[in-house]
């Protein structure tokens, strides 16, 4: 799953403290649905997903994006036990929702893109490396039920 150094943890935690979970969550999930349209099939109940502007303005997309990033915030508090932290969510997404685990990787990559947009020069290659390690670890933890 990857080992987080103290520097990784400090880097991730420091940036996370500046993230607007509602804005970044909505943008991250919205971008996932626009860039990878096949992921929309898991969100049939969200109403109008017919265009990029409809998706980005959809209140259900924003609300679920916030929920996703809120759970990521919990993970940041437990970087040494991502698998345990996400055990229930992994079970839900695997057994009940049947989400393709590849989508977790895509979402993590979209989040890294959103953070880069929001934080600009502050999102250095070192910061990106720590965050990429984290989203990869989270994707792996969420996929653990599938193995």
From Swiss-Prot:
Keyword Lipid biosynthesis: no
Disease entry from the Swiss-Prot or TrEMBL record: Cyanosis transient neonatal: A disorder characterized by cyanosis in the fetus and neonate, due to a defect in the fetal hemoglobin chain which has reduced affinity for oxygen. Some patients develop anemia resulting from increased destruction of red cells containing abnormal or unstable hemoglobin. The cyanosis resolves spontaneously by 5 to 6 months of age or earlier, as the adult beta-globin chain is produced and replaces the fetal gamma-globin chain.
Record's subunit section: Heterotetramer of two alpha chains and two gamma chains in fetal hemoglobin (Hb F).
In-chain residues carrying the UniProt-annotated modification S-nitrosocysteine: 94
Modification type Phosphothreonine: residues: 13
GO cellular component assignments: blood microparticle; cytosol; haptoglobin-hemoglobin complex; hemoglobin complex
Consequence recorded when altering residue 42 to S: In TNCY; hemoglobin Cincinnati
Phenotype for residue 60 to Q: In Sacromonte
Organism: Homo sapiens (Human)
Protein family according to the UniProt entry: Belongs to the globin family.
Residues at which heme b binds: 64, 93
Functional summary from the UniProt entry: Gamma chains make up the fetal hemoglobin F, in combination with alpha chains.
Stated name of the protein: Hemoglobin subunit gamma-2
The keyword Transferase is assigned to this record: no
PROSITE patterns for the chain: GLOBIN
Transmembrane segments: none
Gene3D superfamilies recorded: Globins
Keyword terms of this UniProt record: Acetylation, Disease variant, Heme, Iron, Metal-binding, Oxygen transport, Phosphoprotein, S-nitrosylation, Transport
Signal sequence region: none
Post-translational modification Phosphoserine, affected residues: 45, 51, 53, 140, 143-144
Record PTM text: Acetylation of Gly-2 converts Hb F to the minor Hb F1.
GO MF entries: heme binding; hemoglobin alpha binding; metal ion binding; oxygen binding; oxygen carrier activity
Consequence when changing residue 95 to N: In Columbus-Ga
């Amino acid at each position: 799953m990857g080992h987080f150094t103290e520097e990784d943890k400090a880097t991730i935690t420091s940036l996370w403290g500046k993230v607007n979970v509602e804005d970044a969550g909505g943008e991250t999930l919205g971008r996932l649905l626009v860039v990878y349209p096949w992921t929309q099939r898991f969100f049939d109940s969200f109403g109008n997903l017919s265009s990029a502007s409809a998706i980005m303005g959809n209140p259900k997309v924003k609300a679920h994006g916030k929920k996703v990033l809120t759970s990521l915030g919990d993970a940041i508090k437990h970087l040494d036990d991502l698998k345990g932290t996400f055990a229930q969510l992994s079970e839900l997404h695997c057994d009940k929702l049947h989400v393709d685990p590849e989508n977790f990787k895509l979402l993590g990559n979209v989040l890294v893109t959103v953070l880069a947009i929001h934080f600009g020069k502050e999102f250095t290659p070192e910061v990106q490396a720590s965050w990429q390690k984290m989203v990869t670890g989270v994707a792996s933890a969420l996929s653990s039920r599938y193995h």
